[in-house]
Amino acid sequence: MGLASFIARRILADPERQDRLSRPIVLIAMVGIVLGMAVMVLTVGITRGFQREIRAKVVGVGGHLQLTTIAQNDPKETPRMVFDPAQAKALRALPGVAHVQTYATKPGIVETDGDIEGVVVRGLGGDLDPTYLMRHLVEGRLPVLGAAERPNEVLISAYLADRMRIAVGDTITIYLVKDRDDIRPRKFTVTGTYRTGLEQVDHQLVVVDIGHLQRFAQWGLTAEILVSDTTIGRADLFRVEGLAFGGDRDLMYEWPGTILQGKGPHLIDPAELAHQDGRLSLVVHDASGTIPDTAWVRLKPNDLRRITDSWGTNYPVFDGYTVERGGGGGSHDQYVGGIEVDLTAFDRLDDVEEVVHAQVLEPDQRLTTVRERSPEIFAWLELLDTNVAVVIVLMVVVAVINMTSALLLIILERTTMIGVLKALGATNGQVRRIFLLDGAYILGLGILGGDLLGVVLALVQRWTGWVRLPVESYYVDVVPVDLELWPILLLNAGTLVVCVAALVLPSMLVTRIAPARAIRFD
């Protein structure tokens, strides 16, 4: 093997070869391999980058996994689901999970002075990871999410802003649609615009605080106690009435610690509440099992004193009363439309999905993956792998043809040398090995040159973004590139093995050369 390698190197370094016909042919073959290898490197890098960018855009809108109620059948509207903090904690603890957040969606209508547009209103909370929205923010800022005050702020797409002539800071009306007969308007201030490049997102999605959807949909119950003066002449009696909002309207009122029943109104003597620190509580339930809400009031007479009239009757008098209130915040925020789960890597999707199904998912919940939510996009991305395979096969075929032509010409030019080697006792295998090493050396130089050219072009594109695309057609405005070492090494190894194996057949020409005729060959 050492002798074959030595002779192969001398053949390629032969100074007399400068004037031989094989020199330009070998150079052409090497240039072809360089260009073909560069095309393969760029094809793999651009395809991987494109798949990564599109997956990131789709995942950013709804997460890798979504947990919803089993009643979910419309992606534009999420039924209520009880949010279990323990379940969210269990999800965060799973290997491969990067982030967990809640969300809700409702259909809506955006109205300005002269335009109207149907949208999907997406509610997000304080547990939001803002990275995705910040990355695609065009102008302004994100709405305040998760605050106790819940300001009426909205983030809309740049497409919607241009179409409806809306500017950051403008006030728009959003009609939230509960059902055909229940459409409620609400004013929102536009805080910013975004652009993802995904038509199904940019054309219809607006973002608000999830609390607006929780209360609008009346997923929970809100209890309240109405207190008023009596009209029966008893200054120490108060009229109380239970109020409730939300639920399924088949409401039940409980007044713990009292004999009161039903909504009321009821008359109450604060003295009767002394054992409860003067507090009167109301708990509201409904027949569908909605999480109940509790409200309470404490009645405190102002300047309470007792007087005795001329008949010796002792009774209390006071100058008005003070009502302290508490509770009644509602149980709406204990419901969400669903839970989104973001993973550390897309290739962990199947493993995490299996674990969530087995360990975390409740019987009344449904788990969907991003592939199931956007099957057409992922089918398209998988089709790109077929295109890559076609390009690689074509480039390898071109390399094989180039190298076969170059090797045959080198063999023909070295016919006399082949005859001499055989006359000196070299076997056909040893002579073939010389020319296979020549071919492998030329291939190696071409592959390394192609790697260098492809990587340089890819890095220039990554750093400068000089090749741009129409975002309406390709979802990205710049050709993305994702370079990793292992795909390049696989391309190199595969190309080298296939091409060298293909050179075995033309190298067999050596076996047909007779030493006596070869020595006389000119």
Q: Where are the model-predicted features located?
A:
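Peri-transmembrane interface segments
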Residues: 19-27, 345-400, 410-412
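A hydrophobic alpha-helix feature that marks transmembrane segments and, especially
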Residues: 40-49, 385-423, 431-434, 506-507
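Membrane-interface junction motifs in transport/secretion proteins
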Residues: 47, 51-85
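A short beta-strand structural signal in non-transmembrane regions
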Residues: 65, 160, 332-356
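A structural signal for hydrophobic secondary-structure junctions
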Residues: 80-233, 243-265, 273, 286-290, ...
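Short helix-loop junctions at transmembrane helix boundaries
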Residues: 448-491, 504, 508-512
